[in-house]
Amino acid sequence: MALPPPDLLTCPDCGPGAALSTGAAAETFACPRCGRTFGAGGGVLDLVPKSVPSLTEETVRQFGDSWSSHEYLAPYQEKQFLDWTAPVGREAFRGRTVLEAGCGKGRHTFHIGGYGVQRLFSLDLSDAVLIAAQYTKAFPAVSCIRADLLRIPLADDSVDVAVCLGVLHHLQDPQAGLRELWRVLKPGGTLVLWVYAREGNGWIVALVDPLRKGLTSRIPTKLLRPLLLPLSFSLFLALKLLYGPVTRRGERPVGWLPYAAYLGYISKFPFREVEHIVLDHLCPPIAYYLSRPTLEGWFAELKPATFEFRWHNRNSWNVVAEKAAAGRHE
């Protein structure tokens, strides 16, 4: 792994004002304030806080098992990444210091690391970050860190680009997570966000979400996965026999077919990806569906220089926001 310079790292227990220093042993860092030492193993620097809320721990465990059971890279994942980050493209990462907040198994880390970044911090609280470290061990600019996104162990104004895809809505306090992302972003930097939308997901909020909260999220992921196989296979058949042909694999809008924009989009995916999508929607204890007015209110508090919303597949929000440059007041 690429060990980051200690002046960019902060103690997750003491907060942003507590910069770490190089530890006495190799590949370790220490907090001069509390005396805690942090080490690396398996290519991952461990900067997890001493205490994490139990609901967060359970969500992390469920997701970690989900990602670890779907350990693979595929070419279509890069297209999906670029769709989620549009209009920000590959060149926006070149020569920049980047934070990937919530990297999971590293399916996006692998691509960002190949875009010529100056440095990439890929953070995740789950054990899946160990897989991300293996995927990116050939990239000297990538640092994989096990950390809590509600206490990002980076200094203020330390990254040029922050990317958080499909993760903010799984935090116990999504607004606090957004503030943390904004804190570490440099003035003039860019935040790219993708979250579940409340708009367009009424049937999920009304029918699927209660099932997740009351039942499926309480079943360990390793047991839940085989139980969901009939549902996953039924969805896969519907995608291949109906949604794919009718929508031309997501290229043609169809108003009469329910949830057509999203299901047409994922109709091109293989079964293992569809099965993973089903599992990801039903395994986590924490999941929020965020409305545009809610997100606009949160961003208004941050006073960005610019921010742009895009309704992706009519069921999720992509947000690109620029932090005001130093001395600039909107």
Residue ranges, per PLM feature:
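A short glycine-rich, Lys/Arg-flanked "PGG" loop and its adjoining helix->strand segment in the class I
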Residues: 175-187
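Conserved class I S-adenosyl-L-methionine
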Residues: 190-233
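Substrate-binding/catalytic lobe of Class I Rossmann-like enzymes that use SAM or dcSAM, i.e.
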Residues: 219-292, 296-302
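A short acidic, Gly/Pro-enriched loop at the edge of an enzyme's catalytic core
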Residues: 150-161
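A short, aliphatic-rich alpha-helical micro-motif
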Residues: 92-93, 156, 178
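Conserved N-terminal segment of class I S-adenosyl-L-methionine
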Residues: 2-150, 288, 294, 309-330
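A short SAM/SAH-binding and catalytic strip from SAM-dependent methyltransferases
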Residues: 160-172
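Short conserved AdoMet
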Residues: 137, 172, 186
